[in-house]
Amino acid sequence: MNEGRAAEQDVLVRQGRIERIDPSISPPSPTCEIIDASGKLILPGLIDDQVHFREPGLTQKACIRTESRAAVAGGVTSFFEMPNVSPPTLDMDRLEEKCAIAARNSLANYAFFLGASNENAEVVKAADPAKIAGVKIFMGSSTGNMLVDEEEVLEKIFRFAPTPIATHCEHTPTILENERLAREQFGDEVPFSEHPVIRSREACLRSSSLAVELAKRENARLHVLHVTTAEELDLFTPDHERITAEACVHHLWFEDSSYESLGSLIKCNPAIKKASDREAIRQGVTDGRISVLATDHAPHTWLEKQGTYFNAPSGLPLVQHSLLLMLEMVQEGCFPIETVVERACHAPARIFDVRERGFIREGYWADLVIVDPENQTMVDETELFSQCNWSPFSGTRFSHSVDLTLVSGQVAYSGGEPTDGQTGMRVEFESQRR
């Protein structure tokens, strides 16, 4: 399944790359390894453009090794990791340190966002576009407290950023006022069902609208992350190449009634909102106003998530089951599988100018996932690879399973287990990306 069509084809991989695609290929040598994918789906490996793998500084929650194991188990072959670690990734030295950690430990291909702050606009301006996934701006306060709220700084970053800008869009003053009102009503025992009231649709729309306005004014490339409301979709068009939007799988799957059973486990920023928002976002995925499907994988320990509303951190582990979630939505008729491949594989590669990944093409790196449509997956906590060792999908049965994952031509996941060792490579980007 690739570039809008399905075909029964053999794929020859040599030295990590796809050498040939043909309806019938004879083994080039007696020692050639043959992987029989009869009756199964071969997809490009997913490129997840938003994950939090917590290293360095937050490794009590997760690390690049464990979360990359979960990634390849879920068919994710490349990830772009966010800068809100400790210390935050606010300069190229910190970013290169993270690359060095990933080079030793990651099973998946890796790239890292350079974080923006109120103080580092010149660092952002001088960044090498070939070495970073993009520039991340927290236009709303979230985990890690990297808020950029000075208008002059925002304008400068949008004017000079050498890459696409990825934004977390929530209006912090609105959220703080909603928190004050919630405390007045509930005291410290705020129910988790109030989360979408506190981190409200108005907060999202106000911030996303500002980001789009800045991008148009400064002719910047903007990618708005984790859109959660129907109203925000009106900011985007299917044919706009410079202003794009992402939706995350949990916002496509859960809705506000889910807080009753899952509570803190699905507390995330921005919040999961109404069923009508979920349906609107699914429609946006179909019609192209949503360009990218991703996870915002953000693990915390089980103990941390047991806190009260103001103490339990926002975020949940998703990367191991994101493809299965997308395929479940295909099964339910939300959108076709071709759309999943476009939004989760092809579009991230195009939007972020990724070199030679994201497609099943001759000459490209062999990042491939084999999916078995006849073998179901029951989410069992004994079979989770994220370090936090819990999932909001525990006990869920998915209709597909990930059979095998290749990363740069090497088997990274097979037989229900990630491989030992390191298979990931640093993702390469084009040098002109403004």
Model segments located where?
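Histidine/acidic residue-rich metal-binding segments in metalloenzymes
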Residues: E122-L293
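His/Asp/Glu-enriched, well-ordered alpha-helical/loop segment
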Residues: E189-L210, L214-N219, L265, T286-L293, ...
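A glycine-rich helix N-cap at a beta->alpha junction
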Residues: A100-A116
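N-terminal metal-binding scaffold of metallo-dependent hydrolase/deaminase domains
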Residues: M1-S29
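Metal-associated gating/positioning segment near the N- to mid-region
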Residues: K40-N105
